[in-house]
Amino acid sequence: MAYQNNGGNFRGPRHSFNGQPSGRGNFQRHDPEEDFKSKLTSLIVRIGDKATSSLESNIDALANALLADIPKQSSLIQDILFKCVSSLTYKTPIYATLVGLINVKNSEFGKEVVCRLVDEIFSAMEKKKFHNAKLLIRFIPELVNANVLTINAIFELYETLLSVLNTSDYTPNKADYFVFLVLSTIPWIGEHLSHNHSGQLDAVIEECESYIQSRSTGDKKFYQAYNNGYTDDRLESMLKQIKSLRDCDQPWIVNGILRPYKHFNETLTSSSSQQHILPTIHFPEDEKLEYPNNLNKPLFRVLSNDNNNSVERYIVEDYIIDILSFFNSDHKECSKFIYSLPVENEIDDIVVETILGEMFMLPEPTFKPIYYSVLFVDFFKSQPSVIPVFAYAINLLFENIHKLDFEVMDRFALAFAHHLSNFDYKWIWSDWAQSLVPPTAAAAAAAATTTVEGSTSNENKEDSTATTTAIIEDENQIRNRELRIIYIKRVLSSLCRLSYLEKIKQNLPSEYHQYLPPSPAPTFKFLNADNPEEESKELIAESHKLLLSFKTKEPLENIISHVANIPSHINIVELLTKCILQIGSTSFSHLTYAIERYITLFKTVLKSQDDRQECIRSIFEFWKLSHQHIVIVVDKFVTFKIIYPIDTVTWFMKPENIDRFITEPFTWECLHNSIQKTIIIIQTLTLDLEENQSQEKEFKLNTSISEQQLLLAELVKGLGSILSSEKYQLGASSKLLISGQLKSIIRKYFNQMKPVIQSQPQLSNIINQYTQ
């Protein structure tokens, strides 16, 4: 194979297609067959890495090279080709043109590709590889452009996809996805269809528009990450973009989509006998198949762009989202590939906004938030033009923190902390410090005086109205300032977790020190008789005995016997919990070892819900200077079934704990951890029951489901009670935070909440009242 690809260095993952590690130091004997496969893969994968003037000549040369190998390697070539088509997002036109050129001289190969394409689409759908399925569907219009398929193929495709709207059993997510597939192909085929089939194309667009307008959008606000007035979801945005493309001065001319087939137009259209009929496409009929649920959620828009209704915006954003998906295991290659896209305009604003949008997606991002955060670190090192755009977006979000969903605000804080930790904590801290300062008392006093001196004259009435407006604005400013402080505290707390307190202090301006958490240290009050609470000598002596028995590793039976004989007036639960935490305070591995070693002792002592509540109280008191330790310790105690998931809900909903803890981030970490534990338990028991049916296993599963439903019901009721009561010292920002966390719980655990709401309709009233 003499062909040399001059299209530039491949920016994709090195292991994606041939499975062979690259690099030196491999002294194994070469397999000629594997060498051939590797070279062939490299040629097909790398074609078009850089959209240079040599692209067309490279495609032509590769087509001629592959023609010689097709008689013996057709299956291998198709394997590689379809992996590329379904993964390398902007290269779809290149591979269609390649197939078109081969089809001119070997129509049997073209026919095989068309038949296999139908199978690949079904397989991708069945495996829920929806990004791959979209690109495979998009390959159809490109094959029409390359004269491999007849023009009827695209309308047969549209008819098949839109036929789902005429069935009675389709789900909203399925219908959204199929309409999305139709809209996502139009920019690639619109110009071709506009010549002789514009009426048919308009009919397709109108059918999509009719469906989009008929959809229920009542819960849109529930999933809005940033409430700045932009409410279009993906389908609504695409429809506007496509109609704008159709109705503009140069209709259907799209930048950002390669058109290599135009260079070969004469060759590709030399004979209509080489065109193939698209076989009927079938889709999986599995009712349990879960289609993407994010197409009806409001898009994230923070930067004021004039190009929101430009189809080029969608194309670049779609490329980026595909790349994020296909390269999620290699963030460095992902960041490189994004900036190798064949687009003429600067894309920094779209890159920043798209990745933030993916990170802030509700109810959950596609990948862990850290993935998106790491990409920004990569961009800062390799693409300096991103830096001012990123900084501008971060400042906008901080200034408008009240417009962020609370769950998103939390993700924003964690991501920003991670970013700062990678760049020596450098930021324009002085600018932010000003927005944390409260309004002056003088301004408030002046406003109050004006109100008191108001009269019945029109002029004074106007002054009074203006003053009232000013007071309202001040209240909003106070709320927004409090929200910024909550955000700053979350950022700084996360920074301390990623590093340590003293280092953060050294790198922060002094005005921020007041928002730092205290220095983490255990509080063990049994060390000596001079402790502030003046514990009895008897209690201190018992703690010393217990610690000594732990240190000398006395047999567990002896320790259990000793604890059983401790006088009843001594708080044994507190004593045991704090002594175990003391021996485990050196490190988290010490803690795990201590809990595992003495789990039987705990279960002997903790006999009731009151005992478990006392255990939690003791944990909070011991680690009152470290919220991170509280989260970890409580989670471990739940994991080892020393306390139950619902015990954390009961603890936080106690009146004496609400004012102290309910607005703290670690509270919600504990609650989410407890809910996740119930989900894991139910999943494990379900799998176990499926493998081996028994009444005992079924009983355990039903019991666990009931316990989970009780936990969720008590949590929603508790939060509703807090929000409706006036007895707690909660400001407006605190109530906003609690209602935001309630919304987060409903969103995140919607499937678990549904049966709870159905059995207890009063919960719907709480949810509707406090999450709108």
Curated annotation (Swiss-Prot):
SUPFAM superfamilies: ARM repeat. GO terms for biological process: 7-methylguanosine mRNA capping; mRNA export from nucleus; mRNA splicing, via spliceosome; nuclear-transcribed mRNA catabolic process, nonsense-mediated decay; regulatory ncRNA-mediated gene silencing. InterPro entries: ARM-type_fold, CBP80, MIF4G-like_typ-1, MIF4G-like_typ-2, MIF4G-like_typ-3. Pfam families: MIF4G, MIF4G_like, MIF4G_like_2. Its main location: nucleus. Keywords: mRNA capping, mRNA processing, mRNA splicing, Nucleus, RNA-mediated gene silencing. GO terms for cellular component: nuclear cap binding complex; nucleus. One of its GO terms (molecular function) is mRNA binding. It comes from the Eukaryota. Residues 1-31 are annotated as: Disordered. It is found in: Nucleus. Residues 37-249 form the MIF4G domain. The keyword Transmembrane does not apply. Coiled coil: none annotated. Belongs to the NCBP1 family. Component of the cap-binding complex (CBC), which binds cotranscriptionally to the 5'-cap of pre-mRNAs and is involved in various processes such as pre-mRNA splicing and RNA-mediated gene silencing (RNAi). The CBC complex is involved in miRNA-mediated RNA interference and is required for primary microRNAs (miRNAs) processing. In the CBC complex, ncbp1 does not bind directly capped RNAs (m7GpppG-capped RNA) but is required to stabilize the movement of the N-terminal loop of ncbp2 and lock the CBC into a high affinity cap-binding state with the cap structure. Component of the nuclear cap-binding complex (CBC), a heterodimer composed of ncbp1 and ncbp2 that interacts with m7GpppG-capped RNA. This is Nuclear cap-binding protein subunit 1. It comes from Dictyostelium discoideum. The gene is ncbp1.
